[in-house]
Amino acid sequence: MAKVLTIPKNWSASDIPDLTGKRFLITGATSGIGLAAATELARRNAHVYITARTVEKARDAIKKIGPGLVDYLLMDLTDLDSVRKAAARVDKQFDVVVLNAGVMATPFTKTKDGFELQLGTNHLGHFAFAGLIKDQIKDRLVVVSSFAHKMGSFGDNNQNTIKDMLLGVGKYQKWQVYGASKLANLLFVSELERLRIVNNWSFVPIAVHPGYSDTNLQAVASQMRGAKTEEKITMAINKLLAQPASAGALPTLAACVYPGLLGASFIGPDGFMQMRGNPKLTRAKALAYDQVLAKNLWQVSEELTKVSWS
């Protein structure tokens, strides 16, 4: 298959082909971008698996998705025991796996394994899950990042500093940590592409970001603090300024199905400041391609999760 360096302008969900016989797994597809992507794939006759933390959330999402072949897998990314149990239940090959679930700008909290919540959920939980099921991924591993990665850093980039951040040591700044978690997604894709070539793994890693999209992600932090007024204001601003989740899902959908994409491609919206629009190939900030930082993050992630990709 010819490799492509561009996605046609105005590519949309209507360009998705029939996906009969294809299997997709999407984490965090009970709302927002993940739910929108799952809905479109199911409409094209794909067999879609979604992950959810509870049976109730899974069944509610499947009802929203509507007609189609949809199953669920219970998994809590904040609990590595749950991640391992979910991975052990993955006994089928998936054409595409989408690492989509996430939290944003939450109050300081730790996961069951002692990781800072945002980095533990957005990066470490996914790192572990994907590593445990890598032999079941056929074609693509899609990782949902954010343009907020531009706010992220890992200090002096050495392993001790990275480990401290992942463990929530030091001053907590919720937006900077969210940015670091989204930068971690991109560093993960960069290092995974290098390792894919070395190990001759069959699947291609691709990163995406949804721009500014109307999902409940922005309101979760307010909900955790019990700040009802702030939550209402956030949701009102989203309705006014953000693109709908169905539009925000387009980069993810393109990464899932558009043929010939290169490993470590990064796809986002083509509009002003990449906040909205149709999908296009783009570039992250330079730090996202720092090979030393990517290797250091990878090694620390393997150490903390006790999941080895080799």
What residue ranges belong to the model's regions?
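Active-site rim elements
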Residues: 172-179, 236-242, 284-289
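C-terminal amphipathic/interface module of NAD(P)-dependent oxidoreductases
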Residues: 285-310
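Rossmann-fold NAD(P)H-dependent dehydrogenase/reductase core
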Residues: 2-225, 304-309
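Short glycine-enriched, charge-decorated loop/helix-capping segments at active-site entrances
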Residues: 113-115, 282-287
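Short glycine/proline- and charge-enriched loop/turn segments
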Residues: 161-170, 227-233, 276-283
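Residues at the start of alpha-helices and the adjacent loop-to-helix junctions
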Residues: 50-53, 79, 240, 247, ...
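C-terminal helical subdomain
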Residues: 3, 232-281, 291-295
